[in-house]
A protein has these predicted regions:
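His/Asp/Glu-enriched, well-ordered alpha-helical/loop segment
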Residues: 3-84, 90, 202-209, 220-225, ...
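Short, glycine-/Ser/Thr-/acidic-enriched flexible segments
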Residues: 19-21, 81-83, 94-96, 102-103, ...
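Hard-cation-handling environments
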Residues: 56-57, 61-166
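Short amphipathic beta-strand/extended segments with alternating polar/hydrophobic composition
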Residues: 98-101, 179-185, 239-245
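Non-catalytic interaction/regulatory modules that flank or connect domains
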Residues: 129-211, 215-218, 224, 229
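Conserved short beta-strand edge segments in small beta-sheet-based binding/regulatory domains
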Residues: 229-235
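Conserved small/polar residues in nucleotide/adenosyl-binding loops
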Residues: 260-264
Length: 264
């Protein structure tokens, strides 16, 4: 909020990254950031300008980001600056959302070639426990709950669930190089099975954490079978999974369906 005073606000934009489906549905997107900024003392007009006009100007969308002659009629109507609840959404001057009810609109046309490519991004041979087995001592990554930073937790040459030392691996999945980086993780708290995901910035290879090499292999293989996603594997089967078949990082389901799947 201090950056959004008169001196720096012209050079600021709002953005989100990796918003969970429930966050989007329950809290919102850029509108939620605007609401938070206003709550932290930013002038409402400044917050809206940063969200709309600054972003449009940066991306050279010169006919968007403001309500003025020559601009597209893309705008929202809110109840108040204090609450900032969006009541109506207009796109090119046409009412598209009215108090939460979305008007039907045609899906965008996507080249079939691009669709096929986006659903065929995993090039990984079948993985086995041996692929995750390495007797050499490896560094232990110490997780810090709620923080992006980690700590050096020493070394290990084996999994030790009692002391929360788990196997962690990164499996290259784009070019079938069979490159697998292996290490250990402490602080995750997993007691059985494994968790694997293809959402792993920025290369989005497969990351798997497990209590055994067999579970690591099984969870990673299941991610490949799904063409991407998040898998919780335990006792020889997937106990929870969220398919992300578009490039391994996005769902082709509706927001409501994805919310139900991820909550389950």
């Amino acid at each position: 909020a201090p950056l959004l005073g008169d001196k720096y606000s012209e050079r600021c934009m709002f953005c989100t990254d990796d918003k969970h489906p429930n966050d989007l549905l329950e809290k919102g997107h850029i509108d939620y950031i605007v609401k938070r900024a206003i709550g932290l003392g930013v002038e409402p007009i400044t917050a809206v300008k940063v969200a709309c006009h600054n972003a449009a100007r940066y991306f050279l969308l010169n006919n968007r980001g403001a309500i003025a002659p020559g601009y597209l009629g893309d705008f929202v109507i809110i109840d108040s600056f204090q609450d900032f609840n969006i009541e109506r959404v207009f796109k090119k001057g046409e009412l598209m959302v009215d108090h939460g009810v979305v008007k039907d609109f045609p899906a965008p046309a996507i080249d079939p070639y691009l669709t096929e490519r986006a659903h065929s991004t995993f090039h990984v041979e079948h993985l086995t426990a041996e692929d995750f087995t390495d007797a050499r001592p490896r560094g232990i990554i110490g997780m810090v709950n709620g923080e992006i930073t980690t700590v050096d937790a020493g070394y290990s040459d084996r999994i030790d669930v009692e002391y929360d030392v788990l196997k962690i691996a990164v499996v290259e999945r784009h070019k079938n190089t069979h490159h697998i980086g292996i290490g250990f993780l402490q602080g995750y708290g997993l007691k059985s099975g494994a968790v694997a995901t293809s959402v792993s910035h920025d290369s989005h290879n497969i990351i798997v954490v497990g209590t055994s090499e067999d579970d690591c292999a099984a969870a990673a293989n299941r991610v490949v079978e799904l063409n991407g996603g998040i898998v919780v594997w335990d006792q020889g089967k997937p106990v929870a999974e969220v398919p992300l078949a578009i490039a391994g990082i996005m769902s082709d389901e509706s927001l409501t369906c994805l919310l139900y799947t991820s909550d389950a």
